[in-house]
Amino acid sequence: MALTYRGNVGDLKYTVTGNIATNKNKVVDLAGSDDIISNGGDKIRFILREGEPIGSFYGYKTDGLYTQEEIDAGRFYTFGRIPNAGDIKYVPQREDVKYYGDLEANEDKSHAAISGEDRTIIGKDVPDFTYGVNLNLQWKNFELSVFGQGVSGTMTAFESEQISAFMLNANPREFHRGRWTQENPNPRAIYPRIYGGHSLDDYNQYFSDYQLFDSDYFRIKSISLGYMVPINVVKSWGLSSLKLFVTGENLFTLRADDKMKDFDPESPSGRGLSYLGSKSVAFGVNVSF
């Protein structure tokens, strides 16, 4: 849907155009097949499930990072091993899973274990809405044009930055300073406890909503300010017309998730190796003889 409104206030003329589109989809029939789980990268998982939208992320729900107090009190779940402070706190989806410290002495330790059965849909990478706005203002010899666009209702997963932020070609950015350490035992730290080695099977590397970013954004894609030199002045210079202008691209972006501040919200889910989108400013002159 698109709407345009034109008007003027004295010498000021304006045109405002807005558009919005929605994308609603769901898997209707898998022809008798079970859920289809696919690998979108090193660890990213997608699921096709009847009644759910295409592009649904499939993984573990989390609740921050474990504190040392929780570990000491036995208020944790195992996931292949006993976690340490600073490890991701995976949340079981099965009702019969207990805290490790609540198990009876002779009880099976698997009753406190997270497993693949605890995976669930944790988000999607297809936006609910895409929208844009275009503003044009004219006042005497000046003209201002602004174009912005954004999306709402979508998530992004960056494997390199969340799963292996300090290896290969990943961009560490704020992860080094904001990661969990014994000196910074923040249960909501941007990156969990770090372990040595080169294994992608580390406790903190299972695909989960801890690795998802809210990628809703609104970006000023372009802004242009122009000035048309008065015709009497131009003619005295032997010209037909002369316009001076300055144009900027990608100068300003609003993000729903502060964790996205070092990433380009227009990047798709995947490796996440690219740096922020470039900004540019250009000055120009249009001359007619």
Residue spans of the language-model regions?
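Residues on the lipid-exposed face of transmembrane beta-strands in outer-membrane beta-barrel proteins
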Residues: 1-5, 133-139, 223-229, 235, ...
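Transmembrane beta-strands of outer-membrane beta-barrel pores
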Residues: 7, 20-26, 139-141, 150-154, ...
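Residues that define the transmembrane beta-barrel architecture of outer-membrane proteins
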Residues: 12, 127-131, 216-221, 277-281
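Outer-membrane beta-barrel and related beta-rich outer-membrane complex signature
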Residues: 15, 25-42, 153-182, 254-262
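C-terminal beta-signal and terminal closure region of outer-membrane beta-barrel proteins
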Residues: 40-66, 71, 182-188, 205-208, ...
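Extracytoplasmic gating/loop element in the C-terminal half of outer-membrane beta-barrel translocons
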Residues: 151-243, 248
